């Protein structure tokens, strides 16, 4: 009998803790964790492009135009299928296009929106930049951080459906978490309660 596919998409604001939630689900609940941002970073490196948010946005939009709005979800599910019996399911961080949220729902999955106070998020990003090999990518002022986030929340005028639209993703989410605490145990308890794990 085929094992039922469990799929969770994580979306939210920058520095809210999407990767932390993904890692908790992987380590404590047996999910395969895939960071969509890491997939895009690898592609930027393969193309010899600077790993900057603008290039990652460009690559993701290009893939969506060429391969469909749910392409990043399909890539993650393909990774899970390589060794499906080993995992509970797949959890993907950084869903930033409504087509990705729709694709997660097509699979019967759950979309989770994670947020935190903007200053808390900015401080997290700055504190973790070097440890995550993103010092150059994340070296921004608070104002630049907020401006980049705003650019990713709405399709710009004249943009198309392949572009980032965080607000439309948020509108498609099933579960909402606030992660203002630095305590991972608090976050883990919130995840377990919200997802009924």
Region annotations inferred by a language model:
Residues 13:
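P-loop (Walker A) phosphate-binding loop of NTP-binding proteins
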Residues 16:
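ATP-binding Walker
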Residues 19:
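Walker A/P-loop
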Residues 32-91, 95-102, 131, 143-147, ...:
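ATP-dependent small-molecule kinase phosphotransfer cores
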Residues 93-94, 104-129, 135-140:
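Conserved phosphate-donor/acceptor-positioning beta-strand/loop module used by diverse small-molecule
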Residues 130-190, 194-197:
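Small-molecule kinase domains that catalyze NTP-dependent phosphoryl transfer to phosphate-bearing small molecules
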């Amino acid at each position: 009998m085929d094992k039922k596919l469990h799929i969770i998409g994580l979306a939210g604001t920058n520095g809210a803790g999407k990767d932390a939630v993904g890692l908790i689900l992987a380590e404590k609940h047996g999910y395969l964790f895939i960071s969509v941002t890491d997939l895009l970073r690898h592609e930027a490196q393969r193309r010899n492009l600077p790993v900057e948010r603008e290039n990652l946005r460009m690559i993701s939009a290009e893939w969506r135009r060429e391969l469909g709005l749910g392409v990043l979800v399909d890539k993650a599910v393909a990774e899970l299928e390589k060794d499906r019996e080993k995992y509970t399911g797949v959890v993907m961080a950084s869903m930033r296009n409504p087509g990705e949220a729709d694709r997660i729902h097509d699979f019967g999955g759950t979309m989770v929106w994670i947020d935190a106070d903007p200053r808390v998020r900015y401080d997290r990003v700055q504190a973790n930049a070097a440890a995550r090999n993103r010092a150059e990518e994340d070296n921004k002022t608070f104002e630049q951080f907020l401006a980049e986030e705003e650019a990713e929340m709405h399709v710009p005028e004249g943009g198309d459906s392949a572009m980032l639209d965080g607000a439309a993703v948020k509108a498609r989410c099933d579960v909402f978490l606030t992660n203002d605490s630095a305590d991972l145990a608090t976050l883990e308890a919130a995840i377990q309660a919200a997802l009924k794990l």
